[in-house]
A protein has these predicted regions:
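Amphipathic, Lys/Arg-enriched alpha-helical "gate/interface" segment within cytosolic domains
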Residues: 2-158
Length: 158
């Protein structure tokens, strides 16, 4: 675990851009993939997230995930679609090593969606948790809090 997750005196960690949706970072030193989707969280974007996750899960061992909803301008996902998404993710992830997924939102609606997903994933290998504070999420993920600010300039893919 980092000495002090709130300590931002160290240089920013090195990240790489991953193929897939925009605003996607990989932090190999922390075994972390972070995504900061912009725009509208709707059924289509939720499906895109699911497809992308299936692709990366087939390509490599599970990594910790951090999804930052702070750049969303609107949340328009149907509740029934969130239930279906959680059911599919449980089926797709069956038998795979457990993974931590931190969902951050400073907006109450986004946080509510994250909490609902957290409750739907209880008892599955996907350990999803909703957060309104990045430092608390960093402690739970065992990464420096500076990483979760997503302010570094990622290195392009090779």
């Amino acid at each position: 675990m980092p000495d002090n997750p709130a300590d931002d005196s160290k240089p920013l960690p090195t990240s790489r851009i991953l193929p897939g949706p925009a605003h996607l970072w990989q932090y190999p030193a922390h075994n972390l993939i972070a995504w900061q989707p912009p725009g509208v969280l709707d059924d289509r974007l939720l499906d895109e997230i699911g497809e992308w996750l299936c692709t990366i899960e087939k390509a490599s061992a599970p990594e910790k995930r951090f999804v930052d909803f702070s750049r969303l301008t609107e949340v328009a996902v149907r509740t029934s679609h969130l239930f279906e998404f959680a059911r599919k993710r449980t089926e797709q992830f069956a038998g795979v090593t457990a993974v931590k997924s931190a969902l951050f939102s400073d907006d109450w609606v986004g946080f509510g969606i994250a909490r609902m997903y957290e409750s739907l994933m209880k008892g599955t290998p996907i350990d999803a948790r909703a957060f309104r504070d990045r430092v608390t999420a960093a402690i739970w993920l065992d990464v420096p809090a500076e990483v979760l600010k997503l302010e570094d300039k990622p290195v392009p893919p090779r």
